[in-house]
């Protein structure tokens, strides 16, 4: 997984006092947060999480959570940074990260896909969008997507009806799901995520280059300024537009 750049590279170093193992992990050059990402960054991060859960299940492991904050980007490549999320799978146990995945990945993606104005909601719900809210905000036509029907609408309805998680916990612990069924669940989530498309609406920047008042001479001057700045800073691989 490290060779495929799905996990950061790491070295095992002398263990610290009281530690079983100590790992020195590759540093991420730029830290970003899910509520800052574009639609397709969030979708790529969701796909990575599901890919790792699939690989984990094949080796009798599982991700104990599915937080979007477990993912960072190196360039345009998502990378899963929380190595401690992997744990031994308890036989026939449900996926502990399922609800969190739906709240932090699937609900924001579905809402942005069907109603672009809802795309900024994750900034107000750091822990994920409550499913009993998400299913009410999605348009009725989303119900005809089998994946959203199961993972958002029915999930949200059940959460609303049986909302007291303390009372529900004993029943959840009684649920049994074998490896095959869990792989099918993850596969269903992957198909649903892959089916969603980013919003396509005209915005302030849609026709920027065709409507801009830059003349050819002004554009050339701007390019010259940028090239000069890059040369002075050593031409690093990472740039940030400060406006």
PLM segments and residue spans:
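Amphipathic alpha-helical segments that form well-ordered structural scaffolds
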Residues: 48-51, 188, 225, 229
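Conserved structural core of kinase catalytic domains
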Residues: 2, 6-45
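Conserved kinase catalytic-core helix
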Residues: 40-64, 108, 112
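Conserved class I S-adenosyl-L-methionine
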Residues: 233-243
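Class I SAM-dependent methyltransferase Rossmann-like catalytic core
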Residues: 200-231
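Catalytic activation segment of kinase domains across protein kinase-like and atypical kinase folds
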Residues: 62-116
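N-terminal auxiliary segments of SAM/dcSAM-dependent transferases
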Residues: 94-198
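Glycine- and acidic
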Residues: 31-39, 171-175, 206-214
């Amino acid at each position: 997984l490290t060779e495929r750049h799905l996990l950061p590279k790491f070295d095992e170093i002398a263990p610290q006092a009281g530690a079983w193992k100590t790992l020195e992990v590759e540093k991420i050059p730029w830290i970003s947060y899910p509520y800052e990402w574009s639609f397709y960054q969030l979708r790529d991060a969701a796909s990575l999480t599901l890919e790792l859960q699939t690989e984990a299940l094949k080796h009798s492991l599982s991700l104990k959570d599915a937080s979007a904050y477990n993912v960072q980007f190196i360039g345009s490549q998502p990378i899963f940074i929380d190595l401690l999320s992997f744990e031994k799978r308890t036989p026939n146990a449900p996926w502990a990260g399922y609800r969190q995945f739906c709240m932090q990945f699937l609900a924001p993606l579905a809402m942005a896909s069907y109603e672009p104005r809802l795309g900024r909601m994750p900034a107000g719900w750091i822990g994920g969008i409550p499913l009993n809210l998400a299913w009410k905000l999605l348009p009725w036509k989303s119900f005809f997507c089998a994946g959203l029907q199961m993972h958002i609408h029915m999930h949200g309805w059940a959460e609303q009806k049986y909302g007291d998680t303390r009372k529900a916990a004993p029943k959840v612990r009684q649920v049994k799901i074998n490896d095959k069924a869990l792989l099918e669940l993850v596969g269903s989530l992957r198909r649903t995520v892959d089916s969603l498309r980013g919003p396509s609406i005209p915005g302030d920047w849609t026709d920027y280059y065709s409507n801009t008042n830059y003349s050819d001479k002004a554009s050339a001057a701007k390019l010259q300024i940028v090239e000069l700045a890059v040369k002075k800073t050593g031409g690093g691989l990472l740039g940030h537009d400060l406006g």
